[in-house]
Amino acid sequence: MKLFNIILLNSLFVLIIGCGGGGEATNPQEQIPSAPTVQPSAPDIDTWPSPSWEVVEPSEVNMDESKLKAALDYAFQAGRNTQSVVIVRHGVVVAERYKEGENKDTLATSWSGAKSFTSALIGLAIDQGYIGSVDDKACSYLERWSCEEVVCLSLDCPLSRPLISIRHILEMRSGLSPTDGISIYSDKDDQLLHSLERSILTKPGETYLYSNEDSMILSAIIRKATGLTTKDYAEKELFSKINMVGDWWTDKEGHTMTYCCIDSTPRNFARFGLLYARSGKWDGQQIISDYWYQESTKLADGLDNYGLHWWLYPSVNLIGALGLHTNDIWVYKDLDLIVVRNSVFTKYGTESVRTGQNIHVTTAPNNWNNTNFLSLVTDSIND
């Protein structure tokens, strides 16, 4: 039995590696969603899922049921490996579908969509005074990094970690050395130490390099600044505020995996999307400050589709918390529209701790195109 378990675990790692890496996002820039073909309507800001979601006929929010069905049919075609789709407009569920045998309470996982949750928590820590500024030196919150500048009199001075700001990390421009993308998830008991010990190769702020390790560093920054693990801080200051239940994984050493791995239901993921569709407000309360909402969802200087741990498409005012295998939360702010899509998900092991046989597996969709899918959704709007 032990031998069988070892073989199974090794097979699962091969599957993850073959599908693109643990928690690594697909490249959304290859499929930029098209603009909606309708004029945006004013959101009904008085409707909130507090505590449960209201389900209405699409016509009640000016959406065409047959066209929404076409979007769902696209998502659930054979080989698309879709576990769930939830579509929310004006604060109510207008369409949802689940794989046979699953339902609204079936867990899905975020993969790298968790990075956008981490961004929200950095903003909250700034709003609450735990972090001075997004431009603070990261070393100020990292015990393993010295903030002492390197004294160098030559023309070829080495780069040093004190140059790295929190903004650089959120923009994926830390300058730290790249990795293979999967090793942090597959074989590092202390994922934070692995992330912190990388050497610096390029000047911070100059070179974009998507990195799970960069995001993992934010786990330590949040812990040092707030006195709480990221998992606990999220529960206290984010999840509880929007009536969301989420299980955020940790590594073996107890560090929250801030680059990935929130297990929750699609309807719960839609709550986070609605928070951002409403500019950080929730049922009369400003959860995420307007400053941080604006700052985190604007393009970073020189980047085409990335902000502070959010994927961005300014031409259609669309933002995305996007994960491996199209485990995505799409937010059309102008349309007050949220689209959540998750792949077939299996959780192995008994704990939400990435060690031993505790592991995530999702199935990649075949012949999937974000533009085609999202266009079917937005084309259903009759405003």
Could you say what each language-model-derived stretch is?
Residues 214-221, 260-281, 327-344:
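Active-site-proximal alpha-helical segments within enzyme catalytic domains
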Residues 20-103, 108, 126-132, 375-383:
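N-terminal leader/targeting segments and the immediately adjacent pre-domain N-terminus
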Residues 246, 292-338:
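Active-site Gly/Thr loop motif
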Residues 30-38, 323-383:
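Structured C-terminal helix/loop/strand segments within mature extracytoplasmic catalytic/sensor domains
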Residues 157, 171-251:
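A small/polar active-site loop signature that marks catalytic segments
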Residues 128-174, 226-264:
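Active-site helix/loop module of the DD-peptidase/beta-lactamase fold
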Residues 15-18:
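C-terminal motif of bacterial Sec signal peptides marking the signal peptidase cleavage site
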Residues 91, 108-134, 169, 218-222, ...:
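Active-site SXXK
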